[in-house]
């Protein structure tokens, strides 16, 4: 899990999901997991 100021989808499997005012990137590639805030 990377915590970043700006989250971007890295590959075509990355999905941006908003949960409780936190932006997350969920992907089947474990390296691409990110969250913001």
Curated annotation (Swiss-Prot):
A GO BP term here is: translation
Its domain of life? Answer: Bacteria
Alphabetized, the UniProt keywords read: Ribonucleoprotein, Ribosomal protein
InterPro entries of this UniProt entry?
Answer: Ribosomal_bL36, Ribosomal_bL36_sp
For this record, the Gene Ontology CC terms, alphabetical, are: cytoplasm; ribonucleoprotein complex; ribosome
Gene Ontology molecular function: any one: structural constituent of ribosome
Q: What cystine pairs are annotated?
A: none
Alphabetical list of NCBIfam families matching this protein: rpmJ_bact
Cross-referenced PANTHER family: 50S RIBOSOMAL PROTEIN L36, CHLOROPLASTIC, LARGE RIBOSOMAL SUBUNIT PROTEIN BL36C
Q: Which family does it belong to?
A: Belongs to the bacterial ribosomal protein bL36 family.
Which HAMAP family did the record assign?
Answer: Ribosomal_bL36
The identity of this protein, by name, is: Large ribosomal subunit protein bL36
Lineage of origin: Bacteria, Bacillati, Mycoplasmatota, Mycoplasmoidales, Mycoplasmoidaceae
